[in-house]
Amino acid sequence: MTQPIRYLQTDPRWAKLDYSAKGEKTTIGASGCGPTAMAMVLATWADKSVTPKSECAWALSRGYKAPKQGTYYGYFTPAAKRYGLKAYMLNSTTIYGKQDSPYHAKAKAALDQGHLVIACMGPGLWTSSGHFVLLWKLQGNTVFLNDPASTRLARTQ
């Protein structure tokens, strides 16, 4: 797989735009990693005009913004479906700190088959809270990813 289209939630074109659930005030730059990761998938495989701005607007209009957090997991499947793409949830519980989880093998198999994987990362190497990233290649112990909050391409461990 070649590198997918890359978007940053902190891009000045949309970073300061509203991405707030009822009762909060936040922005795409602070909380829009999920729709930004999905925008990368959609712009790569379906419609190059899709941006984090358009995906955050769609997620907000359908109630997928979680108050005081980011985006509900349930957003991704319908977001893909409206462009004729299939999305599958591999896991819905935490596997934080579980190096031998079967979900790691499922994600690796998906990458080996040329699929993109949106992963929700817990506190650790890449984030201090929850954060969605787009995995697009695995080479040895190096994961190549598009992180909506970073320009760094490859991570190990």
Question: What is the role of each PLM region?
Answer:
Residues 1-69:
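Active-site-adjacent structural segments surrounding the nucleophilic cysteine of cysteine proteases
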Residues 43-157:
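Conserved active-site-adjacent core of cysteine acyl-enzyme catalytic domains
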